[in-house]
């Protein structure tokens, strides 16, 4: 029996308490804001959505506590260790546990607070007593609170991101959009997150602490940093490391890298005249000197992700390196908290003799590059509804090509010209559906690199093959382990999924993208002063082509993701939670066309009320709900026993269950 089963007197009390908690998460807003019907609707949808998610998590927790009252799988290690802390045995440690004790410290605070509240309630009414509550149910409840924390932090992060992307001439405070609210609800419904809200694992609170550090980072980009904010940054970073060691890559590499870019851009001067002159320079030495001065002034090459190519990554790294060296004091002033966190982590590794705390023989850091191939199908699978527009447009384009090709009279075309036209058509299609300026041969390069990774860096951990309770066992069994050539046949699939995920993060249709000028930085005007006509047309049509991230953000996200994954020999969906959440937060919204002035009627009024509603998010919600129902059913209703070759029960006859 858990917290939400403790009050059988009235289930309505539970609902009201949880609903009130959702009000506490929402910021207090001004009266002028509340008077807006649309914003009132947004506020209601957020609270209702959060309320339903928490209710669903509570129901899931109650079902797990009823059907699986004893610790299951990794809970066998986590729950006894947490009990030791609750009993004040702080120096005892299970050598099988690899992660730091952050989860147990959070549970200690929550359980002690809950025990005090229960004792106070029982003094008033004995029916509020927590007699019969098991340690497993008590500790599992902490992850329900983690879901609430994730929801609150995701919404705040989206608010900062939208404020940063808002027009500079926008007046008044920025309030949460429908897209941010719906995105928040969907992230809490992410199947791997929602499933572990009913079990005692470290991943949810680890995600919450990373989001807390991310929210603080976004705040530092909009406010003048102070010494106390720097100290707070160190504290939040160390808190994230207390949950999971790999969080160092997000706190130091990702957030620290973004703040370095921010410090460089903040000090950039206006050099538009130099940029224009540099574009026409014929002398190589003079050109290098001009661009060096431009980069040294802080005007780095950082185009929007939607308009960037692979070549832009090279210029980005080069320009940032030059700018960082010439603006070192300013950069160090901004990122010294992250350097301090890295130093503390290095000290921990030296003291511990390694990264993991226990079971070091089974968790040896390796170079598992294939992890960076697996992440793209995983993101594409869970975020498939967000990619429907791209997939549909691609299918329609192919259909148009095929119809146009077949409509030509056969006798008007020779075999040679037909083959030539078809080849040019295919190449044109691929070029139009890659990043602007990305040459077609780079697809071959990507496929070649992926093939080498598959051949040299495919690691199958013994735990993956030995434990058929995890879905990854079946994914590997029926894919790359089925036949040796299957792993190579999956290479095009990896490449396509990568392009889809990268395209979605950019927020622009690649076939409409325009090449930007050589320099793209604050204070530097583009060489072509007139914006492309297609860009103006997109804005006039109100198409959802804006709000994407910059190239530096995408590169740093990719770097942090790679560092956090390639050091892990074991492939588990839980390891992809933080990379997916950070990616999903940055996916920009569609721009929905506003009703024309003067239009009236029920349809116009309905469009006004639902403006900002993204159909992709509705499909994403339904998709997540369907996956959650399926995994919950498999975990609860399809248990099985392990048996040896003679049919005898193994593992003392315990029931085994399917899970992520």
Curated annotation (Swiss-Prot):
Q: List the disulfide bonds.
A: none
Q: What are the UniProt keywords, alphabetically? A: Endoplasmic reticulum, Glycosyltransferase, Membrane, Transferase, Transmembrane, Transmembrane helix
Documented EC number(s): 2.4.1.256
Q: In its keyword annotation, does this UniProt entry include Ubl conjugation?
A: no
Transmembrane segment boundaries: 6-26, 44-64, 135-155, 185-205, 235-255, 305-325, 338-358, 367-387, 434-454, 488-508, 551-571, 617-637
Q: What molecular functions are annotated in GO for this chain?
A: dolichyl pyrophosphate Glc2Man9GlcNAc2 alpha-1,2-glucosyltransferase activity
The record's principal subcellular location, in a coarse class, is endoplasmic reticulum
Q: Extract the signal peptide range.
A: none
Catalytic reaction annotation = an alpha-D-Glc-(1->3)-alpha-D-Glc-(1->3)-alpha-D-Man-(1->2)-alpha-D-Man-(1->2)-alpha-D-Man-(1->3)-[alpha-D-Man-(1->2)-alpha-D-Man-(1->3)-[alpha-D-Man-(1->2)-alpha-D-Man-(1->6)]-alpha-D-Man-(1->6)]-beta-D-Man-(1->4)-beta-D-GlcNAc-(1->4)-alpha-D-GlcNAc-diphospho-di-trans,poly-cis-dolichol + a di-trans,poly-cis-dolichyl beta-D-glucosyl phosphate = a alpha-D-Glc-(1->2)-alpha-D-Glc-(1->3)-alpha-D-Glc-(1->3)-alpha-D-Man-(1->2)-alpha-D-Man-(1->2)-alpha-D-Man-(1->3)-[alpha-D-Man-(1->2)-alpha-D-Man-(1->3)-[alpha-D-Man-(1->2)-alpha-D-Man-(1->6)]-alpha-D-Man-(1->6)]-beta-D-Man-(1->4)-beta-D-GlcNAc-(1->4)-alpha-D-GlcNAc-diphospho-di-trans,poly-cis-dolichol + a di-trans,poly-cis-dolichyl phosphate + H(+)
Gene Ontology BP term (one)? dolichol-linked oligosaccharide biosynthetic process
Topology relative to the membrane: Multi-pass membrane protein
A GO cellular component annotation here is: endoplasmic reticulum membrane
Q: Which InterPro entries match?
A: Alg10
Which compartment or compartments is the protein found in? Endoplasmic reticulum membrane
| Pathway assignment | Protein modification; protein glycosylation
Annotated region described as Disordered, given as residue ranges: 526-547
Q: Where is the composition biased (Basic and acidic residues)?
A: 534-546
The family assignment reads:
Belongs to the ALG10 glucosyltransferase family.
Q: What does this protein do?
A: Dol-P-Glc:Glc(2)Man(9)GlcNAc(2)-PP-Dol alpha-1,2-glucosyltransferase that operates in the biosynthetic pathway of dolichol-linked oligosaccharides, the glycan precursors employed in protein asparagine (N)-glycosylation. The assembly of dolichol-linked oligosaccharides begins on the cytosolic side of the endoplasmic reticulum membrane and finishes in its lumen. The sequential addition of sugars to dolichol pyrophosphate produces dolichol-linked oligosaccharides containing fourteen sugars, including two GlcNAcs, nine mannoses and three glucoses.
Q: Know the name of this protein? A: Dol-P-Glc:Glc(2)Man(9)GlcNAc(2)-PP-Dol alpha-1,2-glucosyltransferase
- Please tell me the species this chain comes from: Pyricularia oryzae (strain 70-15 / ATCC MYA-4617 / FGSC 8958)
